[in-house]
Amino acid sequence: MARKETNYESMVSELNEIVKQLENGDLTLEESIKSYENGVKIVNKLYKKLSTLEGKIKVVEDEKEEDFGGYSNEY
């Protein structure tokens, strides 16, 4: 079965929900630990996704510089 790719915004939303639940204080200790672990997993996925996107932006910027002969857009 293929794993569904989750987009950045939905992961941030899920992380915000976890934070709200933890801040609310209504979870048991076990539930809090499980939520915290899930939050850490989401943060790691977000970091990985941001790193990947940063690399893509770098490639586009490098290609842009090559297309314009290395000239900067500064005046």
Curated annotation (Swiss-Prot):
Keywords: Cytoplasm, Exonuclease, Hydrolase, Nuclease. Heterooligomer composed of large and small subunits. One of its GO terms (biological process) is DNA catabolic process. Its main location: cytoplasm. Gene3D superfamilies: Exonuclease VII, small subunit. This is Exodeoxyribonuclease 7 small subunit. It comes from the Bacteria. GO terms for cellular component: cytosol; exodeoxyribonuclease VII complex. Its EC number is 3.1.11.6. It catalyses: Exonucleolytic cleavage in either 5'- to 3'- or 3'- to 5'-direction to yield nucleoside 5'-phosphates. It comes from Clostridium perfringens (strain 13 / Type A). Bidirectionally degrades single-stranded DNA into large acid-insoluble oligonucleotides, which are then degraded further into small acid-soluble oligonucleotides. It is found in: Cytoplasm. Belongs to the XseB family. One of its GO terms (molecular function) is exodeoxyribonuclease VII activity. Pfam families: Exonuc_VII_S (PF02609). The keyword Cytoplasm applies. It is an enzyme of class 3 (hydrolase).
